[in-house]
């Protein structure tokens, strides 16, 4: 993630990184600042209105290169977006259950098309919708190699006595 953000920023473009939860936004924003990114701003709904307004204005004026936030960060007036990275794309927090109904993944895709930005959907276990969509549309799916030492055994739970503990 950090390497991709550096490449995008070096090109003079900006990055939006979405995470499903507020604590993840704060932690990732701090991590990016520690790793040398000084024009990083964190944006989410739990900020006070005064802080949120100040950050919105800094973003609008182009003072910020990287925005880390929850799904509301997609609607910020950040210009020249070169990267939209959706971390844990399978998380249900990206889907809004209230009017207006929207899914952060779809908004990210549409904004990425409008901005001609790279859109990355990151997940350790992708949602079936995205996995199927990428396979049908012949998009690039990067899969991590299976780590040695991990052993998987498929167990038919119907064959085990009731109360058996499986770990």
State the predicted function of each range.
Residues 13-21, 41-43:
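Conserved RecA-like ASCE P-loop NTPase motor core of nucleic-acid helicases/translocases
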Residues 59-65, 71-120:
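SF2 helicase catalytic motif II
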Residues 41-49, 91-101, 160-164:
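Flexible beta-alpha connector loops of hexameric P-loop NTPases
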Residues 19-22, 69-72, 88-89, 122-126, ...:
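A short beta-strand-to-loop transition that corresponds to the Sensor-1 phosphate-sensing loop
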Residues 30-67, 75-79:
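Conserved motor-coupling elements within RecA-like helicase/translocase cores
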Residues 12-13, 37, 64, 117:
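Short, high-confidence coil segments that cap the C-terminus of an alpha-helix
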Residues 1-13, 33:
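Walker A/P-loop NTP-binding motif
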Residues 1-4, 110-167:
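Conserved interdomain linker/interface between the two RecA-like ATPase lobes of SF2 helicase motors
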């Amino acid at each position: 993630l950090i390497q991709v953000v550096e490449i995008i920023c070096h090109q003079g473009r900006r990055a939006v990184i979405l995470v499903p939860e507020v604590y993840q936004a704060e932690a990732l924003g701090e991590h990016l600042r520690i790793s040398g990114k000084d024009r990083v701003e964190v944006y989410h709904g739990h900020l006070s209105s005064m802080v949120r307004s100040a950050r919105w204005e800094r973003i609008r004026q182009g003072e910020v290169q990287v925005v880390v936030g929850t799904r509301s960060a997609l609607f910020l007036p950040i210009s020249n977006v070169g990267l939209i990275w959706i971390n844990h794309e399978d998380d249900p927090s990206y889907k809004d259950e209230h009017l207006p109904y929207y899914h952060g993944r779809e908004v990210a895709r549409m904004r990425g098309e409008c901005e001609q930005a790279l859109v990355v959907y990151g997940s350790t276990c992708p949602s079936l919708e995205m996995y199927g969509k990428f396979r049908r549309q012949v998009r690039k799916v990067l899969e991590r190699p299976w780590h040695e030492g991990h052993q998987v055994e498929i167990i038919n739970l119907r064959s085990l006595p009731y109360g058996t503990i499986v770990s």
